[in-house]
Design a protein with these regions (language model features):
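Iron-sulfur cluster-binding electron-transfer modules in prokaryotic oxidoreductases
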Residues: 1-246
Length: 246
């Protein structure tokens, strides 16, 4: 199988180490992975802001670039969910059949559900608290949404439990939003910051050293709170742990 690696623009610009770790992780698991150098934004910021024409152009470019791969994998539940749930409708208005939406996966979802490894050759001797992003929980179902009252599961935890030396915790109010929400963080700054502060405190109450998640946008928001208030905790993307050898 041939896998196309999709790296969202904010990871490319702000957390390039997450993109590098994603590539290395997939290679270490025996995946034939390719990174298209001319990829661009998936169009989510434009669509969320109401710029339909701009988001359509980017959705069309994305589909043309990735549609020939067997799988498309990205380290962002938010952007992956946007492609999966919104690109078909956006492109339908142009008479274009979206071929990429049915084969795109968040990287953790892909490893857990498609590759199904029995072990991951990683070591991370630290305490971590899992952050479930809204898109990951409610659109990709990477973990069980608490409001559905269904049996517990968490694919992030399943993968982290394979890492040597790690201690994994989960905060109270595990499905509660961190307050980022894209444009929400700009338009409702005070509320967004308050939500972020509450979320970080929930994670800190577990006694962890790191907040770990699958969405760098959420982690970026909480990192802002942590830096502003000089809190003794760090953020880390899950792929950085799964690809870790130290």
């Amino acid at each position: 199988m041939k896998v196309g690696l999709f790296i969202p623009c904010y990871i490319n610009a702000i957390y390039p180490n997450v993109g590098v770790a994603s590539y290395k992780l997939l290679k270490s698991l025996g995946v034939d992975v390719d990174y298209p150098l001319d990829q661009t934004c998936c169009g989510q910021p434009m669509a969320n802001a109401g710029f339909e024409d701009e988001s359509m152009k980017l959705a069309l470019r994305f589909d043309d670039l990735f549609r020939e791969y067997d799988y498309i994998v990205g380290p962002s539940a938010s952007c992956v969910a946007f492609v999966k749930e919104n690109h078909p409708g956006i492109l339908e208005k142009e008479g274009h059949v979206c071929r990429s939406a049915g084969k795109i996966y968040d990287i953790c979802e892909f490893i857990h559900d498609v590759l199904r490894p029995t072990k991951i050759p990683a070591r991370f001797p630290h305490k971590v608290s899992i952050h479930n992003s809204c898109h990951g929980v409610r659109e990709l179902l990477i973990s069980a949404p608490s409001e559905l009252n269904i049996p517990y599961y968490n694919k992030l935890r399943d993968l982290l439990d394979m890492v040597e030396g790690i201690e994994v915790f989960e905060p109270s109010h595990i499905d509660e939003c961190c307050g980022f929400g894209g444009m929400f963080a700009v338009e409702e700054q005070a509320v967004s910051v308050c939500m972020g502060r509450d979320k970080v405190k929930d994670h800190m109450a577990t006694g962890d050293e790191y907040i770990v998640g699958a969405d760098s946008s959420c982690l970026m928001h909480m990192q802002g709170v942590i830096k502003r208030e000089h809190l003794p905790i760090q953020i880390i993307h899950i792929v950085e742990i799964l690809a870790s050898q130290s």
